[in-house]
Amino acid sequence: MSETETLVTIARDDSVGTITMNDAQRRNALSKELIEGLVNAIGELQDAKARAIVLRAQPGTRTWSSGHNVRELPTTGRDPLAYSDPLRLLVRRIQACPAPVIAMVEGGVWGGACEVVMSCDFAVASEDATFAITPARMGVPYNIVGTLNLMHSANIPLVKEMLFCGKQVGAIRANQVGIVNYVVPPGELEQQTYKLAREIAENSPLVIALLKEEVRVLSAASPLSPETFERIQGLRRAVYDSEDYQEGIKAFFEKRAPRFQGK
């Protein structure tokens, strides 16, 4: 069995599929290998005609996912969150899957993992779940598509608070602003998640696939002009070429607070 296969497991109960992240040692960091396993698992369940897919971590985990594997971020002036970045591939795969994907969330959700949850069609969270987006704390230039995905899931004031401050947001507040659909006691998380999955699976899969694609296309129907896109990309290039970007990654590995100089 390959490492990718051990990092991600797949189960199926009738027309409901389950994908479990199993890299507890690295707190389910979104490494290239883990994401490859998730993408392949979605494809396998799609081929098996699953009508709903539950994406989860190990039962009782304290961290649903710690976000990007910082060790894989480039340090040579290359865009760390380009179009072909594994996280971007995973988000697009979830969005393109005709079966609704439900994030079953317990524990902390960090960095890019927040976008993974928000890219799912539904999120059911335990009362003790928390969400934090931390690129500003590390000097990492977040991707413009990723920011747009966040804005589709939550109101702009909260998106700014999460991006600018990097503070944790609890499950109840996340529910109030639309990041998660349901908040339940920890002991009821699995029951409520699979109840929702079965309700979806009982409906017409063709209609649901159509509706999911319609929502995806319409929610992305505000294109940027080429000039605006290039201007934003220029700002991002300035960040990942900066001393602050190098300092953020260095501070992470040295387990200290970064000393950003704005240059």
Say what each PLM segment does:
Residues 122, 161, 165-167, 173, ...:
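Well-ordered beta-strand positions
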Residues 1-5, 250-263:
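Terminal low-complexity tails and localization/encapsulation signals of metabolic enzymes
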Residues 62, 92-142, 168:
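Glycine-rich beta-to-alpha active-site loop
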Residues 124-129, 180-230, 259-263:
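C-terminal long alpha-helix characteristic of the crotonase
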